[in-house]
Curated annotation (Swiss-Prot):
GO terms for cellular component: AMPA glutamate receptor complex; cerebellar mossy fiber; early endosome; glutamatergic synapse; L-type voltage-gated calcium channel complex; neuronal cell body; plasma membrane; postsynaptic density membrane. Detected in heart left ventricle. Widely expressed. InterPro entries: CACNG_subunit, PMP22/EMP/MP20/Claudin, VDCC_g7su, VDCC_gsu. The chain crosses the membrane at residues 8-28, 103-123, 129-149, 179-199. It comes from Homo sapiens (Human). This is Voltage-dependent calcium channel gamma-7 subunit. Regulates the activity of L-type calcium channels that contain CACNA1C as pore-forming subunit. Regulates the trafficking and gating properties of AMPA-selective glutamate receptors (AMPARs). Promotes their targeting to the cell membrane and synapses and modulates their gating properties by slowing their rates of activation, deactivation and desensitization and by mediating their resensitization. Displays subunit-specific AMPA receptor regulation. Shows specificity only for GRIA1 and GRIA2. Belongs to the PMP-22/EMP/MP20 family. CACNG subfamily.
C-alpha cells in the first residue's frame, strides 16, 4: 500500500464506501436473512411433508409453503394466533433475532455519514482531517454491523441447540442472500476505513514535507525591544526591507554588542616620534 498514490486511494475508498453503503442498505430493507422449513417425516416411505416454510428479514416474515403460503406479516406481529407455526422453537427464533436489529440500523447510519464526509474530503483535499474522520466512521460502521451479525447467529444457534430431537419431525434453516450482503458490506466498509486513514497519513506527510522548517525563519527587531518574538520568512525579509534599512540594523547591532573604545588621559600619552 505504500506505493499507492493519493488519487488511487481516493478512488478505491470511494468505491469501497459506496459498495458497502449499497449492500448494507439492500440487506436492511429486504426479507431474505433467514430461511426456515419445518415438516414431518412419513414413516411409510420415509418421505417428508412440508408443514411450514418461510423467509424472514429484519422487518417482515413471509411464508412460501404451508397453510400461510403467500402471506407476509410484520415481525412484531408474527405471534398472532391465526399464524400456524409448527413448533415453539420457530417462534423463539423469530423473536430472539429481533435483538440484533438495532445494530444494522446504526451501521447504516454510520456508513452513510462516513460516505458523505469522505466525498466532502475528496472535493476539498486541503481539509486533511476529513479523511481521518470518514475512516473512523467507516470502521465504526463495520464494527456495529459485525456485532449485529454475531448476535443474529448466536440467537439462532441457541434455539436450534435447545430444540428437542424427534424422528417424526424435521427442521432446516439456512442464511439467505440478504445476510450474505450484510457480511460482504462489513468487509467493504472496513477496507474503506483503512484506506481513508492511510490517505490521511499520506496527505499529512506530504504537507509536512512541503512546510518550511523553523530554522529558515530569522528574527526581526521591533520598536519596543532589542529582541522581538516576531519572525519573517527569508523571502519576506528581503522583499519587505530595503538594503539601506538592513545595513543600518546591522550597524546598530554591532554598536550595541561591542563596548565603547577606552579613552586614556592626556598625560599618559606616549609619543612615538624619534625627536
Amino acid at each position: 500500500m505504500s506505493h499507492c498514490s493519493s488519487r488511487a486511494l481516493t478512488l478505491l475508498s470511494s468505491v469501497f464506501g459506496a459498495c458497502g453503503l449499497l449492500l448494507v442498505g439492500i440487506a436492511v430493507s429486504t426479507d431474505y436473512w433467514l430461511y426456515m422449513e419445518e415438516g414431518t417425516v412419513l414413516p411409510q416411505n420415509q418421505t417428508t411433508e412440508v408443514k411450514m416454510a418461510l423467509h424472514a428479514g429484519l422487518w417482515r416474515v413471509c411464508f412460501f409453503a404451508g397453510r400461510e403460503k403467500g402471506r407476509c406479516v410484520a415481525s412484531e406481529y408474527f405471534l398472532e394466533p391465526e399464524i400456524n407455526l409448527v413448533t415453539e422453537n420457530t417462534e423463539n427464533i423469530l423473536k430472539t433475532v429481533r435483538t440484533a436489529t438495532p445494530f444494522p440500523m446504526v451501521s447504516l447510519f454510520l456508513v452513510f455519514t462516513a460516505f458523505v464526509i469522505s466525498n466532502i474530503g475528496h472535493i476539498r483535499p486541503q481539509r486533511t482531517i476529513l479523511a481521518f474522520v470518514s475512516g473512523i466512521f467507516f470502521i465504526l460502521s463495520g464494527l456495529s454491523l459485525v456485532v449485529g451479525l454475531v448476535l443474529y447467529i448466536s440467537s439462532i444457534n441457541d434455539e436450534v441447540m435447545n430444540r428437542p430431537s424427534s424422528s417424526e419431525q424435521y427442521f432446516h434453516y439456512r442464511y439467505g442472500w440478504s445476510f450474505a450482503f450484510a457480511a460482504s458490506s462489513f468487509l467493504l466498509k472496513e477496507g474503506a476505513g483503512v484506506m481513508s486513514v492511510y490517505l490521511f497519513t499520506k496527505r499529512y506527510a506530504e504537507e509536512e514535507m512541503y512546510r518550511p522548517h523553523p530554522a529558515f525563519y530569522r528574527p526581526r527587531l521591533s520598536d519596543c525591544s532589542d529582541y522581538s518574538g516576531q519572525f519573517l520568512q527569508p523571502e519576506a525579509w528581503r522583499r519587505g526591507r530595503s538594503p539601506s534599512d538592513i545595513s543600518s540594523d546591522v550597524s546598530i547591532q554591532m554598536t550595541q554588542n561591542y563596548p565603547p573604545a577606552i579613552k586614556y588621559p592626556d598625560h599618559l600619552h606616549i609619543s612615538t616620534s624619534p625627536c
